[in-house]
Amino acid sequence: GTVKGSLGIGFPAIVMSILPIFIEPALAVTLLAIPIFVTNGTQFLSVEGWPGIIRRFLVAGISVAVTIFVVVQFVADVPSRWINIVVGLSLILFSLTSLLKFELPMSEHPSWQALVGISSGLLGGLSAVKAPIMIYTVGLKLPRDEFICVAGFLFFMGGIGLTMGTLSASLLNGTTTLLSLVCCAIALIGFRVGAMIRKRLSDKVVRTALLWVILALGLRLILTNLL
Protein backbone atom coordinates (compact mmCIF):
# COMPACT_ATOMS: atom_id res chain seq x y z
CA GLY A 1 0.00 0.00 0.00
CA THR A 2 2.85 2.39 0.82
CA VAL A 3 4.47 1.62 -2.55
CA LYS A 4 1.15 2.25 -4.30
CA GLY A 5 0.61 5.53 -2.49
CA SER A 6 4.10 6.85 -3.15
CA LEU A 7 4.66 5.67 -6.73
CA GLY A 8 1.14 5.07 -8.05
CA ILE A 9 1.98 1.54 -9.24
CA GLY A 10 3.38 -1.78 -8.04
CA PHE A 11 0.84 -2.98 -5.46
CA PRO A 12 -0.12 -6.36 -7.02
CA ALA A 13 3.43 -6.93 -8.26
CA ILE A 14 4.94 -6.46 -4.79
CA VAL A 15 2.30 -8.61 -3.09
CA MET A 16 2.38 -11.40 -5.70
CA SER A 17 6.16 -11.52 -5.56
CA ILE A 18 5.96 -12.40 -1.85
CA LEU A 19 2.65 -14.11 -0.96
CA PRO A 20 3.01 -17.20 -3.23
CA ILE A 21 6.13 -18.10 -1.25
CA PHE A 22 3.90 -18.72 1.78
CA ILE A 23 0.40 -19.53 0.44
CA GLU A 24 -1.26 -21.00 -2.64
CA PRO A 25 -1.13 -18.51 -5.55
CA ALA A 26 -4.89 -18.87 -6.20
CA LEU A 27 -5.51 -17.77 -2.60
CA ALA A 28 -3.09 -14.87 -3.00
CA VAL A 29 -4.97 -13.69 -6.11
CA THR A 30 -8.27 -13.98 -4.21
CA LEU A 31 -7.02 -11.95 -1.25
CA LEU A 32 -5.91 -9.18 -3.61
CA ALA A 33 -9.34 -8.76 -5.23
CA ILE A 34 -10.88 -6.21 -2.86
CA PRO A 35 -7.65 -4.27 -2.15
CA ILE A 36 -7.00 -3.81 -5.89
CA PHE A 37 -10.57 -2.63 -6.40
CA VAL A 38 -10.51 -0.16 -3.49
CA THR A 39 -6.95 1.26 -3.74
CA ASN A 40 -7.18 1.91 -7.47
CA GLY A 41 -10.65 3.39 -7.12
CA THR A 42 -9.21 5.75 -4.51
CA GLN A 43 -6.30 6.56 -6.82
CA PHE A 44 -8.19 7.46 -9.98
CA LEU A 45 -11.08 9.22 -8.24
CA SER A 46 -8.61 11.52 -6.49
CA VAL A 47 -7.44 13.00 -9.81
CA GLU A 48 -9.35 15.90 -11.31
CA GLY A 49 -10.98 15.07 -14.65
CA TRP A 50 -11.58 11.37 -13.96
CA PRO A 51 -15.03 11.27 -15.67
CA GLY A 52 -13.34 12.14 -18.97
CA ILE A 53 -10.78 9.37 -18.43
CA ILE A 54 -13.58 6.82 -18.04
CA ARG A 55 -15.14 7.90 -21.33
CA ARG A 56 -11.80 7.81 -23.18
CA PHE A 57 -10.67 4.40 -21.90
CA LEU A 58 -13.98 2.60 -21.41
CA VAL A 59 -13.21 -0.07 -24.05
CA ALA A 60 -9.96 -1.05 -22.30
CA GLY A 61 -11.67 -1.02 -18.91
CA ILE A 62 -14.54 -3.26 -19.98
CA SER A 63 -12.18 -5.61 -21.86
CA VAL A 64 -9.90 -6.18 -18.88
CA ALA A 65 -12.81 -6.62 -16.45
CA VAL A 66 -14.65 -9.17 -18.61
CA THR A 67 -11.50 -11.14 -19.48
CA ILE A 68 -10.38 -11.38 -15.86
CA PHE A 69 -13.87 -12.46 -14.79
CA VAL A 70 -13.79 -15.34 -17.31
CA VAL A 71 -10.20 -16.44 -16.56
CA VAL A 72 -10.76 -16.49 -12.78
CA GLN A 73 -13.47 -19.14 -13.22
CA PHE A 74 -10.71 -21.62 -14.10
CA VAL A 75 -7.92 -20.49 -11.77
CA ALA A 76 -8.78 -23.07 -9.09
CA ASP A 77 -8.31 -25.85 -11.67
CA VAL A 78 -4.85 -24.71 -12.75
CA PRO A 79 -1.96 -26.41 -10.89
CA SER A 80 -0.22 -24.06 -8.45
CA ARG A 81 3.09 -24.71 -10.18
CA TRP A 82 1.84 -23.22 -13.44
CA ILE A 83 0.18 -20.28 -11.73
CA ASN A 84 3.48 -19.53 -10.00
CA ILE A 85 5.24 -19.62 -13.38
CA VAL A 86 2.66 -17.22 -14.86
CA VAL A 87 3.09 -14.96 -11.82
CA GLY A 88 6.87 -15.07 -12.28
CA LEU A 89 6.62 -14.25 -15.99
CA SER A 90 4.22 -11.39 -15.24
CA LEU A 91 6.61 -9.97 -12.63
CA ILE A 92 9.56 -10.22 -15.02
CA LEU A 93 7.58 -8.58 -17.83
CA PHE A 94 6.43 -5.81 -15.49
CA SER A 95 9.90 -5.11 -14.08
CA LEU A 96 11.93 -5.40 -17.29
CA THR A 97 9.64 -3.20 -19.38
CA SER A 98 9.84 -0.56 -16.65
CA LEU A 99 13.60 -0.86 -16.07
CA LEU A 100 14.41 -0.82 -19.79
CA LYS A 101 11.82 1.91 -20.43
CA PHE A 102 10.37 -0.26 -23.18
CA GLU A 103 7.85 1.76 -25.15
CA LEU A 104 5.64 1.07 -28.15
CA PRO A 105 3.81 3.71 -30.16
CA MET A 106 0.40 3.36 -28.50
CA SER A 107 -2.97 4.82 -29.43
CA GLU A 108 -6.28 5.42 -27.68
CA HIS A 109 -8.05 3.74 -30.61
CA PRO A 110 -10.61 1.12 -29.46
CA SER A 111 -8.70 -1.70 -31.18
CA TRP A 112 -5.59 -0.92 -29.12
CA GLN A 113 -7.69 -0.68 -25.98
CA ALA A 114 -9.34 -4.05 -26.62
CA LEU A 115 -5.96 -5.72 -27.24
CA VAL A 116 -4.48 -4.28 -24.06
CA GLY A 117 -7.57 -5.14 -22.02
CA ILE A 118 -7.73 -8.76 -23.17
CA SER A 119 -3.99 -9.43 -22.78
CA SER A 120 -3.98 -7.79 -19.34
CA GLY A 121 -7.02 -9.82 -18.35
CA LEU A 122 -5.42 -13.11 -19.37
CA LEU A 123 -2.39 -12.39 -17.18
CA GLY A 124 -4.33 -10.63 -14.44
CA GLY A 125 -6.85 -13.42 -14.00
CA LEU A 126 -4.07 -15.86 -13.13
CA SER A 127 -1.56 -13.58 -11.43
CA ALA A 128 -3.32 -10.27 -10.56
CA VAL A 129 -0.38 -8.53 -12.29
CA LYS A 130 -1.41 -6.64 -15.44
CA ALA A 131 1.88 -5.72 -17.12
CA PRO A 132 0.32 -4.85 -20.53
CA ILE A 133 -1.57 -1.98 -18.87
CA MET A 134 1.73 -0.50 -17.68
CA ILE A 135 3.32 -0.87 -21.13
CA TYR A 136 0.25 0.75 -22.69
CA THR A 137 -0.10 3.69 -20.32
CA VAL A 138 3.64 4.46 -20.45
CA GLY A 139 3.54 4.26 -24.26
CA LEU A 140 0.78 6.87 -24.39
CA LYS A 141 3.23 9.41 -22.87
CA LEU A 142 0.55 11.00 -20.71
CA PRO A 143 1.15 13.82 -18.20
CA ARG A 144 1.87 12.47 -14.69
CA ASP A 145 -1.56 13.09 -13.15
CA GLU A 146 -3.34 11.77 -16.24
CA PHE A 147 -1.08 8.70 -16.25
CA ILE A 148 -1.93 7.99 -12.60
CA CYS A 149 -5.64 8.42 -13.34
CA VAL A 150 -5.65 6.20 -16.45
CA ALA A 151 -3.58 3.45 -14.81
CA GLY A 152 -5.75 3.65 -11.69
CA PHE A 153 -8.96 3.39 -13.73
CA LEU A 154 -7.79 0.36 -15.73
CA PHE A 155 -6.50 -1.42 -12.62
CA PHE A 156 -9.77 -0.51 -10.88
CA MET A 157 -11.75 -2.15 -13.68
CA GLY A 158 -9.48 -5.18 -13.39
CA GLY A 159 -10.25 -5.20 -9.67
CA ILE A 160 -13.98 -5.25 -10.42
CA GLY A 161 -13.51 -8.23 -12.74
CA LEU A 162 -11.31 -10.00 -10.18
CA THR A 163 -13.74 -9.40 -7.31
CA MET A 164 -16.80 -10.49 -9.29
CA GLY A 165 -14.91 -13.44 -10.76
CA THR A 166 -13.67 -14.76 -7.42
CA LEU A 167 -17.19 -14.37 -6.00
CA SER A 168 -18.68 -16.26 -8.94
CA ALA A 169 -16.06 -19.03 -8.64
CA SER A 170 -16.69 -19.27 -4.86
CA LEU A 171 -13.05 -18.39 -4.18
CA LEU A 172 -14.14 -15.25 -2.34
CA ASN A 173 -16.24 -16.72 0.47
CA GLY A 174 -16.92 -15.71 4.06
CA THR A 175 -13.41 -16.44 5.31
CA THR A 176 -11.45 -15.14 2.33
CA THR A 177 -13.67 -12.04 2.10
CA LEU A 178 -12.84 -11.19 5.71
CA LEU A 179 -9.12 -11.74 5.06
CA SER A 180 -9.32 -9.65 1.88
CA LEU A 181 -11.01 -6.82 3.79
CA VAL A 182 -8.25 -6.94 6.42
CA CYS A 183 -5.67 -6.78 3.61
CA CYS A 184 -7.62 -3.86 2.14
CA ALA A 185 -7.56 -1.93 5.42
CA ILE A 186 -3.81 -2.46 5.78
CA ALA A 187 -3.25 -1.45 2.14
CA LEU A 188 -5.30 1.74 2.57
CA ILE A 189 -3.23 2.72 5.61
CA GLY A 190 -0.09 2.14 3.58
CA PHE A 191 -1.61 4.06 0.66
CA ARG A 192 -2.14 7.12 2.88
CA VAL A 193 1.38 6.86 4.30
CA GLY A 194 2.81 6.57 0.79
CA ALA A 195 0.82 9.60 -0.38
CA MET A 196 2.23 11.66 2.50
CA ILE A 197 5.85 10.72 1.84
CA ARG A 198 5.58 10.89 -1.98
CA LYS A 199 7.11 14.36 -2.16
CA ARG A 200 10.00 13.42 0.12
CA LEU A 201 11.15 10.46 -1.94
CA SER A 202 13.20 10.24 -5.07
CA ASP A 203 10.72 8.44 -7.31
CA LYS A 204 13.48 7.24 -9.61
CA VAL A 205 15.67 5.67 -6.91
CA VAL A 206 12.82 3.96 -5.04
CA ARG A 207 11.12 2.74 -8.22
CA THR A 208 14.35 1.32 -9.63
CA ALA A 209 15.18 -0.53 -6.40
CA LEU A 210 11.68 -2.01 -6.19
CA LEU A 211 11.76 -3.10 -9.83
CA TRP A 212 15.03 -4.98 -9.27
CA VAL A 213 13.52 -6.70 -6.22
CA ILE A 214 10.41 -7.66 -8.22
CA LEU A 215 12.61 -8.98 -11.06
CA ALA A 216 14.63 -11.14 -8.65
CA LEU A 217 11.50 -12.54 -6.99
CA GLY A 218 9.94 -13.25 -10.38
CA LEU A 219 13.02 -15.19 -11.47
CA ARG A 220 12.95 -17.09 -8.18
CA LEU A 221 9.33 -18.13 -8.70
CA ILE A 222 10.06 -19.45 -12.19
CA LEU A 223 13.26 -21.28 -11.28
CA THR A 224 11.84 -22.94 -8.16
CA ASN A 225 8.81 -24.20 -10.11
CA LEU A 226 10.74 -25.39 -13.17
CA LEU A 227 13.62 -27.15 -11.41
For each of these PLM feature ranges, what is it?
Residues 1-22, 103-151, 158:
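Selected transmembrane alpha-helices and immediately adjacent juxtamembrane segments
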Residues 24, 79, 83, 143, ...:
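A helix-boundary/kink motif common to multi-pass secondary transporters
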Residues 29-36, 151-158, 214:
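Transmembrane helix-bundle signature of multi-pass membrane transporters/permeases
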Residues 30-80, 160-204:
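Selective hydrophobic functional segments
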Residues 40-50, 72-73, 77-80, 84-110, ...:
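Transmembrane helix exit motif
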